Amino acid sequence: MTKIAPSTAVNRYYLARMTAAEHNERMTSREGASEETGVDRKRLQRIEIGTLNPYPEEVLLMADAYHAPELLNFHCSRCCPIGQRTVPPAEKSGLDRITVKFLNALESIKDTDKELLRIAQDGELSPDEVPQMKHLLHAVQGLAAIACEIQIYIDKRSPQIERR
């Protein structure tokens, strides 16, 4: 049996390939994955050991070939400097867990519409309203992360990853 470096054993791209290998024998080796994705074998190795961040196009290829839509969110929210500021990290969760998170998030924004109207009624954001606005933003960002989880859940169950 081949030894796996500790950094590789927890790498999201490697784990996605190994999950894909359960259904596609070619994914058991980097050589086979390279042929399936079009990403060079040595480059895949460096991506999987964590010494190289893949290009977005490579992540798209791997997500499609491995049927792992969660790689898209992972890359954008954790590897891309712009995405780290703008894309909420999402988990690959089951429907029951997503539902509970969604209902909790809805409960947390229950009266935010009234609060937002109160803040916006004069058309200005005063310094004392900034903390309230940040609280509203945090609640909405929580919903955005849950929306990403729902998208991952749907894409994972689709026969083929659909383009939005």
Can you annotate each of these PLM segments?
Residues 90-98, 107-132:
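Acidic, glycine-anchored loop motifs typical of Ca2+
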Residues 3, 75-104, 157-164:
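Short, charged recognition helix plus adjacent turn
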Residues 17, 34, 63:
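The alpha-helix within a helix-turn-helix
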Residues 117-164:
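Mid-protein regulatory/catalytic core that forms ligand/cofactor-binding pockets
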Residues 1-25:
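A short, Lys/Arg-rich alpha-helix, primarily the initiator
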Residues 57-75:
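DNA major-groove recognition helix of helix-turn-helix/homeodomain DNA-binding modules
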Residues 21-46:
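Short alpha-helical DNA-recognition segment
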Residues 60, 100-110, 134-148:
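Generic structural signal for well-ordered, non-transmembrane alpha-helical segments
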